[in-house]
């Protein structure tokens, strides 16, 4: 019985050591959180490229620590520090007892310790800004296209759009301005997420350019949207259409108007890139 107990204890002890040595990677853990289904996983190769990180150090506080946390360098350094602390614990105690005044001077020169929750918040902000840049690249567009095909961003609530898939976007590229919006390629309108778990997501983590780049990259989607019938709802009372000049008549109807003649299409093409001459 004693030998069996020793064998069982050795097995459990080895399994505990393996579990303690393993840790979850930060990026997959962040993207798998509840309410983060709109995010895609950014490869570490993209983050390690200094060109892709240009000017982000000026926008995110504690940039270096946040970047190390995203790349899982923080977890590795913590494990090394724990091992060093166990080995050198006795030596540090002896030095502190012998050199109290010298240690006080060292403590004053050391940088203040930052709370881990602050670093975690900075890492989330940094990853969101990196994510906004990554989804404009070819691999990022492909990753977002898979989510688009699976309708992970939802469908347009407008009846005449016939369940068109939506695209996430932001009203500003600056953090803290607006939450995420959903763009419909069919009616070209913006909507709030229907689920409350997405209402607090930062819009800058997808940026203002993503829907336009997405539609230009996937030409078949743009052509499909152009082939769809452009119908708009008309108010009627007992089958009679309400006059546009009536008090209860339709407003801002021009927002859903589309070119119908060749002249209208030429004017539309000019307005897309320049102001037409009056």
From Swiss-Prot:
This is Casein kinase II subunit beta. Residues 1-22, 78-111 are annotated as: Disordered. It comes from Saccharomyces cerevisiae (strain ATCC 204508 / S288c). InterPro entries: Casein_kin_II_reg-sub_N, Casein_kinase_II_beta-like, Casein_kinase_II_reg-sub. Belongs to the casein kinase 2 subunit beta family. Keywords: Acetylation, Phosphoprotein. The modification Phosphoserine is found at residue 2. The keyword Acetylation applies. One of its GO terms (molecular function) is protein serine/threonine kinase inhibitor activity. Tetramer composed of an alpha subunit, an alpha' subunit, one beta subunit and one beta' subunit. Interacts with FACT subunits POB3 and SPT16. interacts with YTA7. One of its GO terms (cellular component) is nucleolus. The keyword Phosphoprotein applies. GO terms for biological process: DNA damage response; maturation of SSU-rRNA; nucleolar large rRNA transcription by RNA polymerase I; regulation of cell cycle; regulation of ribosomal protein gene transcription by RNA polymerase II; regulation of transcription by RNA polymerase I; regulation of transcription by RNA polymerase III; ribosomal small subunit assembly. It holds the Pfam family CK_II_beta. Present with 8120 molecules/cell in log phase SD medium. Residues 78-94 have a biased composition (Acidic residues). Regulatory subunit of casein kinase II/CK2. As part of the kinase complex regulates the basal catalytic activity of the alpha subunit a constitutively active serine/threonine-protein kinase that phosphorylates a large number of substrates containing acidic residues C-terminal to the phosphorylated serine or threonine. It comes from the Eukaryota. The modification N-acetylserine is found at residue 2. Phosphorylated by alpha subunit.
